[in-house]
A protein has these predicted regions:
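Hydrophobic faces of well-ordered beta-strands that scaffold small-molecule active sites
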Residues: 2-4, 23-25, 56-59, 79-81
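Conserved active-site-proximal phosphate/metal-binding subdomains
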Residues: 35-41, 45-57, 63-213
Length: 213
């Protein structure tokens, strides 16, 4: 099965024509590269659902039952979670970084490489702030190459030093408040999604009397 990441409807349509089995449609909230259109998932997901016929997974800003229910309502078949799974017991990253994700809020990420038209959403730290400042001064990639080196980013996850390098994290950090096991997380999301659909949202379903009328 081939699932292709897309950050725009046009890219999703191209992937569909090329024969992929499904797409991951990534809204602007996502960690890593959100594309250059800056369209949030609330708009991008239904826009893609209106035109794309193959299965679609919603990505970017998802981490709980509310996000899952919203994604289904917007036209996706499910959700993809990146930053949320980083903060789980099974995640191989350092415990200090998991706790940093829990401590961060939705404003914590920085956008780097904006001036280079290769935007990336990363966790805000001393290095990301330095990169942003250099970009404002007209820096080119060569000027920040050492700061954003992959080896430095890997050391963040291995050593647990938040400021050791650049590391990706999405805006969903603002809704992450614990470090559960993957099993606990999935069961919680499914249970709470069912409660939302059959509880709070059930109030919007027509009654038998209304249907008969």
């Amino acid at each position: 099965i081939v699932i292709h990441k897309c950050t725009s409807v046009r890219h999703g349509l191209s992937a569909e024509r090329m024969g992929v089995d499904a797409i991951s449609i990534d809204g602007f909230e996502c960690a890593g590269h959100p594309g250059e259109d800056d369209v949030p998932g609330l708009i991008l997901i239904p826009a893609a659902a209106d035109k794309i016929k193959i299965p679609m997974i919603a990505s970017g800003g998802f981490g709980d039952a509310r996000g899952l229910v919203a994604a289904l309502a917007l036209g996706a078949e499910g959700i993809n979670m990146g930053t949320r799974f980083m903060a789980t017991k099974e995640s191989p990253i350092h415990e200090a970084i998991k706790q940093q994700i829990v401590a961060n809020d939705e404003r914590a990420p920085d956008l780097i490489f904006r001036t280079m038209h290769n935007t990336s959403r990363v966790a805000r730290n001393a290095v990301s702030q330095q990169v942003v400042a250099l970009e404002r001064q007209g820096a080119k990639f060569e000027d920040v190459r050492e700061l954003v080196a992959g080896v430095r980013g890997r050391s963040v996850y291995e050593v647990g030093d938040n400021d050791a390098g650049i590391w990706s994290a999405g805006q969903i950090q603002g809704l992450i408040r614990d470090v559960p096991s993957c099993e606990e997380l999935i069961h919680r999301i499914v249970r709470e999604a069912e409660e939302l659909i059959h509880g709070r949202l059930a109030r919007f379903a027509p009654t038998k009397q209304a249907v008969q009328a």
